[in-house]
């Protein structure tokens, strides 16, 4: 079995930063946490995306929401596990009611502790249920190899009608795992709603 060289591998955090930059993301709003440092360190290393820190997660989500509305493009927000994600929830409801395309990247405890109520730092039982209540849809990245497919699905969902905020949970241990470098990620696939011709004729 042939092993890949270090130059062809990168952390999931680096893959996330690279993917977002490749699809045109130039700014991310958020709050720095020990749980999202692998992603934010990668953003700083690559230097292709500006990170705008907020004093609280609600403010970060408001900024991401406003950015999405004004720019008519994807707003991206990054928060931390549990309380951090919860702090963004109220502002995310505002984005949901406005139909603003926001990607909410939040984190999760290591997979061995997820959904087990073991008291891991920042862990909140049923975090996914909370996020589903304030999101158009919610994804969870279980494996490093799904990093690009998960990001593509989440960004496409946010930008496809009806637009709205989409949450993506990424466990801390997954962020540190290694994956093959993939460059030049394609733009998100936007699913367009085609009107029914007969219905249009009836209305006309």
Predicted regions and their residues:
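N-terminal alpha/beta PP-like core and its mobile active-site loop of ThDP/TPP-dependent enzymes
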Residues: 2-204
């Amino acid at each position: 079995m042939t092993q890949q060289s270090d130059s062809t591998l990168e952390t999931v955090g680096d893959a996330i930063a690279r993917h977002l930059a490749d699809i045109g993301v130039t700014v991310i709003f958020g709050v720095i946490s020990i749980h999202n440092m692998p992603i934010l360190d990668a953003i700083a290393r690559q230097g292709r995306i500006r990170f705008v820190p907020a004093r609280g997660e609600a403010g970060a989500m408001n900024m991401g929401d406003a950015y999405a509305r004004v720019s008519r493009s994807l707003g991206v927000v990054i928060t931390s596990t549990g309380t951090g994600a919860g702090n963004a929830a109220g502002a995310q409801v505002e984005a949901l009611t406005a139909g603003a395309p926001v990607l909410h990247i939040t984190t999760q405890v290591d997979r061995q502790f997820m959904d087990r109520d073991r008291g891991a730092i920042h862990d909140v039982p049923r975090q996914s249920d909370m996020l589903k209540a304030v999101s158009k849809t919610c994804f969870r990245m279980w494996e490093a190899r799904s990093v690009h497919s998960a990001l593509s699905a989440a960004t496409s969902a946010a930008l496809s009608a009806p637009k709205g905020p989409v949450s993506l949970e990424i466990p801390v241990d997954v962020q540190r795992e290694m994956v093959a470098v993939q460059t030049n990620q394609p733009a998100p696939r936007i699913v367009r709603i085609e009107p029914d011709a007969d219905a249009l004729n009836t209305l006309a």
